[in-house]
């Protein structure tokens, strides 16, 4: 299913594009499909801007030409995944702890295409998947306490392959936050959390996604569809 979604996303890519390369399992499949198109000559003069060290390493291994985010005035198209998508195309991202670079790339993109499976579609954000908040190591407890006053329950994300917490590409830590009633006003909450001293960025992507491509299984057959934005 993820491969079908990834392959379909590549159909949006045109020769000469500067392309934002997303992170995560579906994005990795997209990067591999992109590399094959470039290798076969079906796509030419593509330059990629990776959203994480993970996607950068994969792109380099597959010989996709890369360009630094700071050196481009805009990105033609960014293709990325999401952890949750609501009917207004507001997103939670950051399950891979790289939402800071993902948001930088998304905000510079002329178009942001989100590729997901049907399980990521939700009516209200944050009722299941926690909101990642990247914090300075010295500030995590202070930020946790402030978020608690906002009715949010925070847990420091712990690593699975090493002792201690997850450390981001920027050298920071991640608080995973669940709010009592979920997130009803993503725009307001994004601003309030980012205004907390010690917070670098949170995983709410508000008014950034232009199109969502969804894969699902229907009668044992993989099906693609693109929902309409509610608002």
Curated annotation (Swiss-Prot):
Family to which the UniProt record says this protein belongs: Belongs to the ribose 5-phosphate isomerase family.
Assembly notes: Homodimer.
Organism: Prochlorococcus marinus subsp. pastoris (strain CCMP1986 / NIES-2087 / MED4)
Entry's EC annotation: 5.3.1.6
Catalytic reactions on record: aldehydo-D-ribose 5-phosphate = D-ribulose 5-phosphate
GO molecular function, one term: ribose-5-phosphate isomerase activity
Binding residues for substrate: 23-26, 80-83, 93-96, 120
EC main group: isomerase
Protein role: Catalyzes the reversible conversion of ribose-5-phosphate to ribulose 5-phosphate.
Protein's recorded name: Ribose-5-phosphate isomerase A
One Pfam assignment: Rib_5-P_isom_A
Active-site residues, as the UniProt record annotates them: 102 (proton acceptor)
Keyword Cytoplasm attached: no
Domain of life: Bacteria
GO CC terms of this entry: cytosol
């Amino acid at each position: 299913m993820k491969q079908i979604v990834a392959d379909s996303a590549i159909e949006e890519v045109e020769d000469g594009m500067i392309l934002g390369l997303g992170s995560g399992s579906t994005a990795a499949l997209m990067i591999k499909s992109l590399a094959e198109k470039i290798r076969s000559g079906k796509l030419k003069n593509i330059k990629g801007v990776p959203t994480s060290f993970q996607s950068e390493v994969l792109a380099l291994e597959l010989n996709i030409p890369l360009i630094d985010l700071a050196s481009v005035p805009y990105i033609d198209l960014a293709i990325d995944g999401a952890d949750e998508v609501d009917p207004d195309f507001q997103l939670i991202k950051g399950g891979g702890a790289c939402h800071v670079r993902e948001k930088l790339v998304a905000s510079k993109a002329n178009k942001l295409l989100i590729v997901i499976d049907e399980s990521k579609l939700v009516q209200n954000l944050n009722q299941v998947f926690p909101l990642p908040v990247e914090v300075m190591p010295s500030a995590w407890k202070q930020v946790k306490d402030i978020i608690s006053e906002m009715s949010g329950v925070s847990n420091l994300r712990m690593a699975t392959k090493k002792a201690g917490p997850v450390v981001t590409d920027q050298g920071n830590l991640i608080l995973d936050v669940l709010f009592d009633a979920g997130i009803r006003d993503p725009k307001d909450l994004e601003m309030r959390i980012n205004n907390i001293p010690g917070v670098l960025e949170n995983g709410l992507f508000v008014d950034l996604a232009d199109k969502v491509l969804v894969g699902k299984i229907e009668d044992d057959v993989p099906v693609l569809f693109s929902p309409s934005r509610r608002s």
